[in-house]
Amino acid sequence: MKTIIWKQFGASIDMLENAVRACPEALWGDRSQKPEFWYVAFHTLFYLDLYLSESDAGFTPPAPFTLDEMDERGLLPERVYTKEELQKYLEHGREKCRATIASMTGEKADRRCGFEWLDLSLAEMLL
């Protein structure tokens, strides 16, 4: 079962990677696009990282990213993140996802996820 879940999750991460790589530079930081392409990729990676964590308590994304993404006012990052920065974040997320799935047990999968705003088991949240 872990292999099946990883193949599907991994394929989704691969598709995001393909989109990031294929995005033309002119579109990447185009402020006229709402939402901006780079921001959609960042938002996806941030929440992949967060939801692969035990809970939001103590969660810190890797530098140069911050917790501003969780601000209820919808603050955008202070600058446009580069493709290279998001590619590194994607690799971080891919490895974290692989490790999370590999260490999954039936007991762990049935546990409530550690995010108070989600009434789901860990398995339900990941699917």
Region locations from a protein language model:
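Acidic/histidine-rich alpha-helical segments that form the ligand environment
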Residues: 73-111, 123-127
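Short, contiguous alpha-helical
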Residues: 6-10, 14-17, 25-72, 112-127
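Hydrophobic alpha-helical core bundles mediating ligand binding, dimerization, or RNAP-core interactions
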Residues: 9, 13, 20, 90, ...
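Charged/polar positions within long, soluble alpha-helices
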Residues: 18-21, 49, 53-56, 95-106
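N-terminal leader segment of winged-helix/HTH proteins
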Residues: 2-3
